[in-house]
Swiss-Prot record:
This is GTP cyclohydrolase-2. Pathway: Cofactor biosynthesis; riboflavin biosynthesis; 5-amino-6-(D-ribitylamino)uracil from GTP: step 1/4. One of its GO terms (biological process) is riboflavin biosynthetic process. InterPro entries: GTP_cyclohydro_II, RibA, RibA-like_sf. It catalyses: GTP + 4 H2O = 2,5-diamino-6-hydroxy-4-(5-phosphoribosylamino)-pyrimidine + formate + 2 phosphate + 3 H(+). Its cofactor is Zn(2+). The active site is at 126 (proton acceptor), 128 (nucleophile). The gene is ribA. GO terms for cellular component: cytosol. Keywords: GTP-binding, Hydrolase, Metal-binding, Nucleotide-binding, Riboflavin biosynthesis, Zinc. It comes from Shewanella denitrificans (strain OS217 / ATCC BAA-1090 / DSM 15013). Its EC number is 3.5.4.25.
Length: 205
C-alpha cells in the first residue's frame, strides 16, 4: 500500500479550527483525511480517533447508527483537550461501499441484523483494513494514542502496526430507538466494548 500526502488546509468547525491533511492511496485511488487540532510532542500520547466514512450518519443525520454522534463527540473532546487527531477513512459501510450498505439496510428493514445483512450479500461482517493509518500517523507525528473507540479491532490494528495505545477512551453516545438493536449486535457479535449503562440509559430515546 502506498499512501501519498497531498496538502493541508484549515477547517473551521463549531468546536474550533482544525487542520485538514489530505492523503491518497495510489493503489485504490481512495482519498483519506487526517484532522488535527493543536500541537504536540511525538513522544506524548495523543487523544485521537479512527473514523470510517459514514455518509448516512456523518452527513445525512441518520439515527440508524451511532457514527455521526461519535464523530461530533470526538471532535468536541479533542477541542476541549486542546490537541488531538481524527483519521477519517473512506471505508463506507464497514468497507462494503455505499450502495451495498443501502442493500444491507434493505435487508435490515426486512428483519436481518447488521451482521446477517452483510453476510447475505456475500461480505464479512467487517471488511475494513487499517494499513493506511501508519503513514498518516507518521505524517502528523503521532506514535502513542489515547484512542476513542469501542471497537477492539481498531485497538489491535494500531498495536499490530507498532503504534502504542496508551489508553482506550470509550465513546458511548447516540443511542436511540432506531439504533438500539444495531448497537446490541455490535456488542454481542462484533465484540464492541459497551457498558450495560449505555443500553439502560434512555436519554437518547
Amino acid at each position: 500500500m502506498s499512501i501519498n500526502y497531498i496538502a493541508t488546509s484549515k477547517l473551521p468547525t463549531p468546536w474550533g479550527v482544525f487542520s485538514m491533511h489530505g492523503f491518497e492511496d495510489t493503489q485504490t485511488g481512495k482519498e483519506h483525511v487526517a484532522l488535527t487540532f493543536g500541537e504536540w510532542q511525538p513522544s506524548h500520547a495523543i487523544l485521537g480517533r479512527i473514523h470510517s466514512e459514514c455518509l448516512t450518519g456523518d452527513a445525512l443525520f441518520s439515527l440508524r447508527c451511532d457514527c455521526g454522534f461519535q464523530l461530533q463527540t470526538a471532535m468536541q473532546n479533542i477541542a476541549e483537550a486542546g490537541q488531538g487527531f481524527i483519521l477519517y477513512l473512506r471505508q463506507e459501510g464497514r468497507g462494503i461501499g455505499l450502495l451495498n450498505k443501502i442493500r444491507a439496510y434493505e435487508l435490515q428493514d426486512a428483519g436481518a441484523n447488521t451482521v446477517e445483512a452483510n453476510e447475505r450479500l456475500g461480505f464479512d461482517a467487517d471488511m475494513r483494513k487499517y494499513d493506511m493509518i501508519a503513514p498518516m500517523l507518521e505524517k502528523i507525528a503521532v506514535t502513542q494514542v489515547k484512542l476513542m473507540t469501542n471497537n477492539p479491532r481498531k485497538v489491535k490494528a494500531m498495536q499490530d502496526l507498532g503504534i502504542v495505545v496508551a489508553e482506550r477512551v470509550p465513546l458511548q453516545v447516540g443511542k436511540n430507538r432506531y439504533n438500539e438493536a444495531y448497537l446490541k449486535t455490535k456488542s454481542t457479535e462484533l465484540g464492541h466494548m459497551m457498558s450495560e449503562h449505555h443500553f439502560n440509559d434512555d436519554k437518547g430515546n
